[in-house]
């Protein structure tokens, strides 16, 4: 256990996250990384969420709230946007009802996936199938193969440390269910991935193993082309706008990794403190049996400490189940984005090498071969898709972290309110004893 309050986040490089320019902020490559460019609101998340969202006048209460007692209104503001989006969607997917299956060779969990859609690609308006984790992994692999130019959402980590995390515990299964539900909803909201044939099969096929054994190859021409890029070409210079994206992702992942490690230490200390509280409160209760006039106040203190320990347990559970999974998801998200960026670099390197070979030909006006033009088309497609997915990812990140941090603030307010009420409740009791004397 750490011997004091967590230290401030250590520096991870010469550039802080807030000082780094937004990768897509400028209209040109130079503006994207220029030292004079103004950081976008998305990268100023640590300072504010916008002038209208979290203005803290006189005393720090967010504008629009009368007191900490109305803290739940912080989360209520976020529901309106979701309701509006739901009116325009034509595909809804829900992951629920986890079930444990015990077989001779293995034990595993399956999840029910319910799909409702009005799209013509679906023969029925509603489907219900059961899938296990390795089926989700299969889907993600197929999406990476068939849509190499797009950012594929990450899955939660498959492996857990035996003896430390029980992968069949109710808490672990529920955390994984939420992550898998988020994974499918990310795909559902994507304008390209949601129409992928592998995704359709995943949502509708009763027996997915039959498709796996057939080894169906539904790769697009783009997927085949990128799949056979061996990486033997060396990129000379990454364009400035994509270099800015790479730098941002590196710094972003480092910051989240640091927050994740510190948050885990905080949770560990809170759990240890909770153990001490549970031993601390009953001492006053047993002491009260030896006292006369002090018996009632001592029982009150014992009950107060018990209420505080219950509130702390709820706060710790919220951090474990809601806060940490989002951090880890976005750390994995940044790795996925780096992978797509690397594929884009390989295509550009191939194009530059082929173009240079044409330029070296001893001809006055060498004709550009068709394969070079196709390579250029692939590179331009990669650039466009990567920019669009990066912008979509930034929007999702802003929404997710805004909700995460507001939820964290709300839970902390509730925790301290409960502790305050617990301690205030014994004051009248102590005053009565003093007046009686």
Swiss-Prot record:
Biased composition (Low complexity): 63-73
Homology family: Belongs to the sorting nexin family.
Keyword Protein transport: yes
GO cellular component, one term: early endosome membrane
Subcellular location: Early endosome membrane
Name of protein: Sorting nexin-30
Upper lineage: Eukaryota, Metazoa, Chordata, Craniata, Vertebrata
Role summary: Involved in the regulation of endocytosis and in several stages of intracellular trafficking. Together with SNX4, involved in autophagosome assembly.
Residue ranges constituting the PX domain according to the UniProt record: 89-210
Record PTM Phosphothreonine, positions in chain: 38
Molecular function terms, GO-annotated: phosphatidylinositol binding
Record Gene3D superfamilies: Arfaptin homology (AH) domain/BAR domain (1.20.1270.60), Phox-like domain (3.30.1520.10)
Sorted UniProt keywords: Endosome, Membrane, Phosphoprotein, Protein transport, Transport
Segments for region (Disordered): 1-44, 54-73
PANTHER family found in the cross-reference section: SORTING NEXIN-30 (PTHR45949:SF1), SORTING NEXIN-4 (PTHR45949)
SMART domains: PX (SM00312)
Annotated positions of the Phosphoserine modification: 40
Subunit architecture: Heterodimer; heterodimerizes with SNX4.
Topology with respect to the bilayer: Peripheral membrane protein
Domain BAR: 234-437
GO biological process: endocytic recycling; mitophagy; piecemeal microautophagy of the nucleus; positive regulation of autophagosome assembly; protein transport; reticulophagy
Positions of a 1,2-diacyl-sn-glycero-3-phospho-(1D-myo-inositol-3-phosphate) binding: 132, 134, 162, 176
């Amino acid at each position: 256990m750490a011997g004091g309050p967590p230290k401030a986040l250590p520096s991870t490089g010469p550039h802080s996250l807030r000082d780094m320019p937004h990768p897509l902020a400028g209209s040109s490559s130079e503006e994207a990384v220029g030292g004079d460019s103004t950081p976008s609101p998305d990268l100023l998340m640590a300072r504010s969420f916008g002038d209208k969202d979290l203005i803290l006048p006189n005393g720090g209460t967010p504008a629009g709230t009368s007191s900490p007692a109305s803290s739940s209104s912080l989360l209520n503001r976020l529901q309106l946007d979701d309701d509006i989006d739901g009116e325009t969607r034509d595909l809804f997917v829900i992951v629920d009802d986890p079930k444990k299956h015990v077989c001779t060779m293995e034990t595993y969990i399956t999840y029910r996936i319910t799909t409702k859609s009005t799209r013509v690609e679906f023969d029925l308006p509603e489907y219900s199938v059961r899938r296990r984790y390795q089926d989700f992994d299969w889907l993600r692999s197929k999406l990476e193969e068939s849509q190499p130019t797009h950012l594929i959402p990450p899955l939660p980590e498959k492996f857990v440390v035996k003896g430390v995390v029980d992968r069949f515990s109710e808490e672990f299964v529920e955390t994984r269910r939420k992550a898998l539900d988020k994974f499918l909803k990310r795909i559902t909201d994507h304008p390209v991935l949601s129409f992928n044939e592998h995704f359709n099969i995943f949502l509708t096929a009763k027996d997915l193993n039959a498709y796996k054994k057939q080894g169906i190859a539904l790769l697009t021409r783009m997927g085949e082309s990128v799949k056979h890029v061996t990486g033997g070409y060396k990129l000379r210079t990454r364009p400035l706008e994509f270099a800015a994206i790479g730098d941002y992702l590196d710094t972003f992942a480092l910051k989240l990794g640091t927050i994740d490690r510190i948050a885990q230490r905080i949770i560990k200390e809170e759990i240890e403190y909770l153990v001490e509280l549970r031993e601390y409160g009953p001492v006053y209760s047993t002491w009260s049996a030896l006292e006369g006039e002090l018996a009632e106040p001592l029982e009150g203190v014992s009950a107060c400490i018990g209420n505080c320990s219950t509130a702390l347990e709820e706060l710790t559970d919220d951090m474990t189940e809601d806060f940490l999974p989002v951090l880890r998801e976005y750390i994995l998200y940044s790795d996925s984005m780096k992978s797509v960026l690397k594929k884009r670099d390989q295509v550009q390197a191939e194009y530059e090498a082929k173009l240079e070979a044409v330029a070296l030909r001893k001809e006055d006006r060498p004709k550009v071969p068709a394969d070079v033009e196709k390579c250029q088309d692939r590179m331009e497609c990669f650039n466009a898709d990567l920019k669009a997915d990066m912008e979509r990812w930034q929007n999702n990140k802003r929404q997710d972290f805004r909700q995460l941090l507001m939820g964290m603030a709300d839970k902390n307010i509730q925790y301290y309110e409960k502790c305050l009420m617990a301690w205030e409740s014994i004051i009248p009791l102590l005053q009565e004893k003093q007046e009686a004397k």
